[in-house]
Regions:
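Sec-dependent N-terminal signal peptides of Gram-positive bacterial secreted proteins and lipoproteins
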Residues: 1-26
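N-terminal propeptides/low-complexity segments immediately following signal peptides
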Residues: 26-48
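A cross-family detector of function-defining hotspots
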Residues: 47-66, 70-72, 77-118, 125-127, ...
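Glycine-rich loop/hinge motif
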Residues: 133
Length: 192
C-alpha cells in the first residue's frame, strides 16, 4: 500500500514538473520570437527614428486630429467632469484634487483650469485598459505601428505620438506611447 502511494505521488510530481517546464518553454519561445520580430522591424528603413522628426519649424502643424473614439480610455473622454468619471467608474482607488486613479489608469486635471475639474489628460501604466484600437501597456511597438501606422512625431523623450501638435509649443492633442525600445510602458492621452 505504501509503495503504491509513493509511486502515484512520484508520477503526479513528474507530470507537474513536466507541465511547468513546457509552459516556461512556450513563454520563452514567444518572448524570443517577439524580440526577433521587433529587432527585424527596427532594421527596416521604414522603422521610425527620432532624428527623422527634428526638421520642423517652431509652431509648424504636425499630424491631424484623431477621431473622438481614439481620445477615450475606459469609456471616459477628455473634457469629462470628475463627477461624471466617478458616476461611470465608481469610487477611485485614489483621489487628489487634480487626479483620479483607478488602478493603473489616471485621469488628470490642470489646476490652472476652471475650478470644476475636468479630465485634461489620461495615463495608463498597466494592462487595466486599452486604447480604442486595442493597444495596451506591454504590447510591442511593431503592433503599435501595424495598427496606428508611423508616428506623427517622436519627441525628445523618444515617445511615439499620434495626433495633432504644433512643434515647440504646448498645443498637443493626441496619444503618446512611452516605451522601453520594444514594448509600450505607458499610454498618455492628452489635450494640452
Amino acid at each position: 500500500m505504501k509503495t503504491k502511494f509513493i509511486a502515484i505521488s512520484l508520477g503526479v510530481a513528474l507530470l507537474l514538473v513536466r507541465n511547468v517546464s513546457s509552459v516556461a518553454d512556450a513563454s520563452w519561445l514567444s518572448k524570443a520570437m517577439d524580440r526577433l520580430e521587433t529587432s527585424n522591424a527596427k532594421l527596416s528603413p521604414t522603422w521610425p527614428k527620432a532624428e527623422q522628426y527634428r526638421h520642423y519649424r517652431p509652431g509648424q502643424a504636425i499630424g491631424a486630429p484623431l477621431p473622438d473614439e481614439d481620445m477615450r480610455i475606459a469609456g471616459v473622454s477628455l473634457g469629462t467632469s470628475f463627477d461624471a468619471v466617478k458616476a461611470s467608474l465608481g469610487q477611485p482607488t485614489s483621489e487628489k484634487r487634480d487626479e483620479l486613479t483607478y488602478g493603473g489608469i489616471k485621469f488628470g486635471h490642470s489646476l490652472m483650469q476652471d475650478s470644476r475639474p475636468i479630465v485634461w489628460y489620461m495615463t495608463v501604466s498597466n494592462r487595466d485598459a486599452v486604447t480604442a484600437r486595442g493597444i495596451a501597456v506591454g504590447d510591442s511597438l511593431k503592433k503599435v505601428m501595424d495598427i496606428y501606422g508611423r508616428p506623427d512625431f517622436i519627441d525628445f523623450n523618444n515617445r511615439w505620438f499620434y495626433g495633432y501638435l504644433r512643434y515647440n509649443s504646448d498645443n498637443i492633442v493626441g496619444i503618446f506611447f512611452e516605451h522601453n525600445g520594444s514594448k509600450v510602458t505607458k499610454i498618455i492621452i492628452s489635450d494640452n
